[in-house]
């Protein structure tokens, strides 16, 4: 029914995906995932787990990855707005150590596909945001890894507004830098 617009990003393997939205006087309808449309676009992943979180403005989650059980993720903002980031940790990649960020919102309905081999995180820009993600592997708490969100070697340009108070978990404050991150 739907069909999707798939835009490759500057880093190979990352894609911004825009669904077809059908609007009328009742509201709108869209398919957030259709396996046939994704396969037709060359995106041949299998999702095994869906997650959803709610966060308030200034929450910064990340940058996370799993080492032995890496996860590809299809992420979107169900409500509110986030700045979503992926950092390439694939050692053989031409863009190793580079990052890409995109604004995802309930209004723009964009989704972001991040394959295995990336660190991932997001910053909430709206008063609240509900964030949904489909994963290609299950969450394994003992396999979790991460890197500092503000590592100057990577230099992610987070859109932190003047006066915005960041809310970062104790765990995320303790991650090492890019040099200490797991390499895929």
Regions found by a protein language model. Give the residues of each.
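Short beta-strand His + acidic residue motifs that chelate non-heme Fe in jelly-roll/DSBH
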Residues: 112, 120-125, 133
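Non-catalytic, conserved peripheral segments adjacent to functional cores
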Residues: 1-107, 126-128, 135-184
């Amino acid at each position: 029914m739907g069909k999707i617009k798939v835009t490759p990003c500057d880093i190979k393997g990352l894609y911004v995906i825009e669904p077809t939205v059908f609007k009328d006087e009742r509201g709108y309808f869209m398919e957030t995932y259709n396996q046939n449309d994704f396969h037709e676009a060359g995106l041949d992943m299998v999702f095994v787990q869906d997650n959803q979180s709610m966060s308030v403005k200034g929450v910064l989650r990340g940058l996370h990855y799993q080492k032995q059980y890496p996860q590809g993720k299809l992420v979107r903002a169900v409500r509110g707005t986030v700045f979503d980031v992926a950092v390439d940790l694939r050692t053989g990649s031409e863009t190793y150590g580079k990052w890409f960020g995109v604004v995802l919102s309930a209004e723009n309905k964009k989704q972001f596909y991040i394959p295995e081999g990336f660190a991932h995180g997001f910053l909430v820009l709206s008063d609240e945001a509900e964030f949904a993600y489909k994963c290609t592997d299950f969450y394994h708490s003992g396999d979790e890894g991460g890197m500092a969100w503000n590592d100057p070697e990577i230099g992610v340009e987070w859109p932190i507004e003047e006066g915005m108070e960041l809310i970062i978990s104790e765990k995320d404050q303790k991650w090492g830098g890019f040099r200490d991150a797991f390499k895929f």
